[in-house]
Amino acid sequence: MQMKLKSILLGAALLLGASGVAKADKGMWLLNELNQENLDRMRELGFTLPLDSLYSFDKPSIANAVVIFGGGCTGITVSDQGLIFTNHHCGYGAIQSQSTVDHDYLRDGFVSRTMGEELPIPGLSVKYLRKIVKVTDKVEGQLKGITDEMERLRKAQEVCQELAKKENADENQLCIVEPFYSNNEYFLIVYDVFKDVRMVFAPPSSVGKFGGDTDNWMWPRHTGDFSVFRVYAGADNRPAEYSKDNKPYKPVYFAAVSMQGYKADDYAMTIGFPGSTDRYLTSWGVEDRIENENNPRIEVRGIKQGIWKEAMSADQATRIKYASKYAQSANYWKNSIGMNRGLARLDVIGRKRAEERAFADWIRKNGKSAVYGDVLSSLEKAYKEGAKANREMTYLSETLFGGTEVVRFAQFANALATNPDAHAGILKSLDDKYKDYLPSLDRKVLPAMLDIVRRRIPADKLPDIFKNVIDKKFKGDTKKYADFVFDKSVVPYSDKFHAMLKSMDKEKFAKAIEKDPAVELSKSVIAAARAIQADAMANAYAIEKGKRLFFAGLREMYPGRALPSDANFTMRMSYGSIKGYEPQDGAWYNYHTTGKGVLEKQDPKSDEFAVQENILDLFRTKNYGRYAENGQLHIAFLSNNDITGGNSGSPVFDKNGRLIGLAFDGNWEAMSGDIEFEPDLQRTISVDIRYVLFMIDKWGQCPRLIQELKLI
């Protein structure tokens, strides 16, 4: 993935390299970097507005309405009272946090009839982009003469931090300096961070998650993947902590909502915050991703999710607690499966090797050997030498850091003992995790994860807990060891842990927690991870240097071609058209779906396709009102916009900058898109904004929200 400087310096996994050249109109473009070439192509596709209507330093623009929702999604401001539309799966954690067995908003949905009924969501934030400024010269000027890549990265991070500090951001702003274009350029970015965010409306999961894991990444799609929140501000309309006295935020700009629909080949544009892509990855990097990251992830998550699913199916309270965690895990699990299939189907490794041969020919014919001569060979060497460590780290991360939860809990517990000054923050984080945790379920997960670790990691790299405890005291029986941990440790149990914390002073607590079985396990796992990381880092720096030089070389090789920077969860736009596609020979997928498909798919015996009767009746009677087009209600649509994870909730705009949908997924046939964009196959799946309004109006009976919007 595209790595930030701090991730490179602190990361626990190998970094990836770069290759591949995207066409000028296929990319995730920085709005402040759009040029005449981009505009000409946008005009050709049907765009009608001036460029500064998208992003401007000195006047309101569409970018002012697009937000980072939570920690990894996008949202769009749609009213002058801070109303935000995003995806249901983006709001899923917030919906779950407010759900109980008696008030199950995941199952039944949530409708606030007044602003007073809107529910505050502790910990949820919304970020508005304030400005983005290129600072490449200021950073690069401090890097001259540094030849060691590790030192170069450290110095770059130091300079970036200094530039961010000089911005004098207040406590309600986030100021960062990010590397772009494979660490060849740098931009300073400032966000306003709003922390009073309230839940306004959520459809039932039978709508917002219709199709479940079966339909995830698939087309045709009939998912009403949306939820509604509101941003509140202080009396001065600036960000403020939650207060009952706060008022709805008055945004600089909000999006108008189109009721006009779309047809095939109409202009479509997304703006959002894509998380990471690897479009310049080399063939060796692609092999590494498949063998040493995706394959381990598929294996581990499949086993973990099977254990979770069985427990969730048997008990409603467990389902609520684990719903969000399961969805997040399964999403990336299925993505990895689809990515591997797509990479093979499209022969991406073969394409990358052809690109590498072209790069090598350019170097030879243009006398560039002194600068770029060893770039490809150094990348090949680094990937091959680092493959073993990367695979081991992925297995360790997926099993004991990301599989069983008790190891992470123990890390928090140990941090309380070793960082008493940060006591309140650590304890709050731990308590937040306790709310959605079942020790009895994790007791089943732990031995399954330990068994995978033993099978997949060499004996000399295993955490020493295997040799010293599991083998010595339990004769290798991981189930008996897991029972021991959960019987003797206080860490998995909120009540026991808090009782211990309250009954001891800091010194006694530190001594006691050090001997806790879960903490001993955690320390052993961390030590093993550090040893593997040490093996990985030398190759990681070599890969990072190769990436930087390879991209710089590509820019020289193609001087007249705009090469978009890989995604790094900063604001990007993508322009394209409404289009269906051919998934396989002899088949064609239409560019939109309708309510007819909901009735065809619905199945009361399936937890993924069951829909409440009162919703089905709306489809049966075709009670669509003004939201219909030719007597049908459009549910979802396709466009060839370029998106990835992080774009969830991104607004889809028409040629006039009006909202026509919310992006929520990509298609199964193009899961390789983070590495190789395939214009004939890759599609963005979006929920039609008219279906969103239909659910708010006809099902939710919430006209106050419709009245807030600017409908055109």
From Swiss-Prot:
An example Gene Ontology CC term for this record: cell outer membrane
A matching Pfam family: Peptidase_S46
Keywords: Aminopeptidase, Cell outer membrane, Coiled coil, Hydrolase, Membrane, Protease, Serine protease, Signal
Effect of residue 666 to D: Nearly abolishes catalytic activity toward Met-Leu-MCA
Subcellular locations according to the entry: Cell outer membrane
Temperature dependence per UniProt: Optimum temperature is 43 degrees Celsius, using Ala-Phe-pNA as substrate.
EC code(s) of this entry: 3.4.14.-
Biological process according to GO: peptide catabolic process; proteolysis
Molecular functions per Gene Ontology: dipeptidyl-peptidase activity; peptide binding; serine-type aminopeptidase activity; serine-type peptidase activity
Coiled-coil ranges per UniProt: 136-173
Bilayer-crossing regions: none
Domain of life: Bacteria
Consequence the record notes for mutating residue 666 to A: 61% of wild-type catalytic activity toward Met-Leu-MCA
pH dependence: Is active against Ala-Phe-pNA over a broad pH range, from neutral to basic pH (6.5-9.0).
Presence of the UniProt keyword Membrane in the record: yes
Family indicated by similarity: Belongs to the peptidase S46 family.
Designated name of the protein: Dipeptidyl-peptidase 7
Taxonomic source organism: Porphyromonas gingivalis (strain ATCC 33277 / DSM 20709 / CIP 103683 / JCM 12257 / NCTC 11834 / 2561)
